[in-house]
């Protein structure tokens, strides 16, 4: 007999927290360096080795430098890690809508995310999924998550709320300059979050993510360029979602994915757009209006 596997606030927290926590922590941190290695004659450019400039660069790479919309997509595969052995579970296609607004002391980001689960290595939407470790077949239910608004200080640090989608959580993260090579710049975003889904006395849902974001250096340091396309890769280690019904099996979920950030909604991956237009046509038809709706409620 099949059970229901809700793609809900409790089992999308890995992807979502990684996205929401991009750029959080005590602040953006440029790499330690005695002096900027940028060639002379670039006066007026942002310096990635200066803390204030790096906060601006970080905002541009993660979102955009001015007010408006941007969009991110992610293709990933989820694995079960049990006794050092990886078992593919399924793949996923995620898309996120971001609206950025500058505030008096920083900026705020409103996010709406939509994830579709697919068969491993394909774009085929899953209506049910067989857990290879338990043998149980789980029916899939899907829904958008958000919109949720988070506030950032001018230095790039997040004003952490006390709850996330109605659940108490604790989080920390860092965003730092990883490397500059030629006309490429890389940032590392490491985040760690614990979501107390069953109250403070029960083990939390634990999300650890390592994200790498890459963009063109010339775009990043240009103070007149607020729209910097970027690519990203992520690796996550998460607790079992409750809805996987893993029982007493000891292990973790591993997610490996790649994606990008763009500024034209119609240039999101075609497979994701096709699913969104079929299943959530209201979001596809008017992404701006979707960001103004009341956040959907998801329960197991």
Residue ranges of predicted features:
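Coil-to-beta-strand transition motifs
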Residues: 108, 225-228
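Edge beta-strand at a domain terminus
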Residues: 234-300
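Mature extracytoplasmic/lumenal regions of exported proteins
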Residues: 219, 227-238
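Predominantly extracellular/secreted and cell-surface proteins with exposed
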Residues: 84-220
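C-terminal segment of N-terminal export signals and the immediately downstream linker at the start
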Residues: 6, 27-61
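Short beta-strand segments that buttress and anchor functional surface loops
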Residues: 75-78, 189-195, 236-237
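Active-site-adjacent core segments of small-molecule enzymes
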Residues: 47-50, 54-92, 96-109
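N-terminal export signals
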Residues: 2-6, 11-33
